[in-house]
Amino acid sequence: MRKTSKMINQIYQLTKPKFINVKYQEEAIDQENHILIRPNYMAVCHADQRYYQGKRDPKILNKKLPMAMIHESCGTVISDPTGTYEVGQKVVMIPNQSPMQSDEEFYENYMTGTHFLSSGFDGFMREFVSLPKDRVVAYDAIEDTVAAITEFVSVGMHAMNRLLTLAHSKRERIAVIGDGSLAFVVANIINYTLPEAEIVVIGRHWEKLELFSFAKECYITDNIPEDLAFDHAFECCGGDGTGPAINDLIRYIRPQGTILMMGVSEYKVNLNTRDALEKGLILVGSSRSGRIDFENAIQMMEVKKFANRLKNILYLEEPVREIKDIHRVFATDLNTAFKTVFKWEV
C-alpha cells in the first residue's frame, strides 16, 4: 500500500465576526487527481465582507462558521501528481465543488450536492489548497492582480451564457442596472460577447457611471427617460435596491425580453408580476459559475483592452502576512468603491 504524504496546513478561519484564528491541520498532499496550490493574490467579495462584519442571519453564521474566507484567488502549483500542470505554473482556483461538471442541459453550480468554498467550507485563506484537477484553470498572459478576480468575472460569464441560451435573438440594446464592480464587469462582458450591441447603464452615482465610457447611454435611476427601451437586461444591484432595480427593468424592457437577476438580497423583494406577465418576460436567476465560465473569463481577460478596463475597478492593498493584516484589508474594503485585491504572503 502506498504511503500517503502529509503536511501541516495553516488555515486562517473566521470563528465569529471580526475574529480570526489560525487552525493547524494535517492534510494529505498527494491525493489522487488533486493538485496542490499556494495562493498568491486574493480579492474580497461582498459575501466575505458580510460574514466578516456579521451581517448575516445569526443562524446562518452559526451554521457556516468557523471557516476560511475568500473564494476569489489565483496561485501557483507546488505539486501535481496528475502531471496536468507544471510546478510553478500560474492557475486560478474554482470554489464551486460539484459532484460532476456541467452538461448540455444542467449547470454544475446548481446541482444537488454542490458545495462552495468560503460558504460553510474553508475558502482560500490557507497556506496551501488541494483541489481536484478539474477545479483548476491555468492562465499565462494575464497580470496576477487581474487574475485574482477571475471567479468574479466568471460569474458574469455564466450570466451571459444563460442570456445567450434563453433570450430571443434580437439583442440590439442591452441594459445593465447598477454601477458597482459587478455591473462594470457585466457591461464589459456584453461588449466582449456582443460587440455590436448598444449598452445602456442605469446607476445612482455619476462618478461611477463615468467609468462606463464604452456604453452607449448612462442614466441616473431617478431620471430615466420615459421612452427608454431595450431588448434584454442584467440586474446587478443587490441589497435593498434589488426590488426597485428589477421593477425598473420590467417597466422599460421590451415585450418578451429576458432579465438576468444577479444581485443578492438578504430579504424577500416585491416584484411587479402584472407587467412581467403582460410583457411575457423571462426572469432568470443566475448565481456563481462553473469551469467553462472560468475558461471564458480567462479568454476575455487575455484581451488587453478588457484587462486594462478591469484594472479600473481594482484597489491593490498591501500584502497580508499575518492576522492583523487581514483585519486591515477588510477595513480598507469597507471604504473602497470597487474590488480590493491583495497579495497573500503568509
UniProtKB/Swiss-Prot annotation:
Fetch the Gene3D superfamilies from UniProt.
Answer: Medium-chain alcohol dehydrogenases, catalytic domain (3.90.180.10), NAD(P)-binding Rossmann-like Domain (3.40.50.720)
What are this entry's molecular-function GO terms?
Answer: ribitol-5-phosphate 2-dehydrogenase [(NAD(P)+] activity; zinc ion binding
A Pfam family the protein falls into: ADH_N
Kindly indicate whether the keyword Ligase belongs to this entry.
Answer: no
* Protein name per Swiss-Prot or TrEMBL: Ribulose-5-phosphate reductase
Species whose genome carries this gene: Streptococcus pneumoniae (strain ATCC BAA-255 / R6)
EC primary class: oxidoreductase
Question: What functional role does this protein have?
Answer: Catalyzes the NADPH dependent reduction of D-ribulose 5-phosphate to D-ribitol 5-phosphate.
- Pathway assignment: Cell wall biogenesis; poly(ribitol phosphate) teichoic acid biosynthesis
